[in-house]
Amino acid sequence: MKSLILSAAALALTAVLPAQASEDLAKKHLCTTCHVVKGAKTIGPAYADVAKKYAGQKDAEAKLADKVKKGGQGVWGQVPMPPNAAVPDADLKALVKWILSVK
């Protein structure tokens, strides 16, 4: 019984940690200066809106990763998104997967 409870707790933690880890990565790389997870657009779009826009696109991860690395302008308004080339590839992959999963 004790091992069953511990297994359930470990499973629950693994379900929560990736999302939190990615939100923490967004904070670490200063993404949250311009973006929120859900809600009204601040400077940049909310991640939930980004996920909706890219939903169903086969190349969504590659497109979004490219936007993060190189920056962009004109997709969400006239305020440019600065390039974030210093974000390590592993962090970038985790961030993009997380952003695209936000509901």
What are these regions (language model features)?
Residues 1-20, 98-103:
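Post-cleavage N-terminal segment of exported redox proteins
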Residues 20-37:
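Sequence/structural segment immediately N-terminal to covalent heme-attachment motifs in c-type
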Residues 33, 42-54, 66-96:
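Axial heme c-ligation environment in periplasmic c-type cytochrome domains
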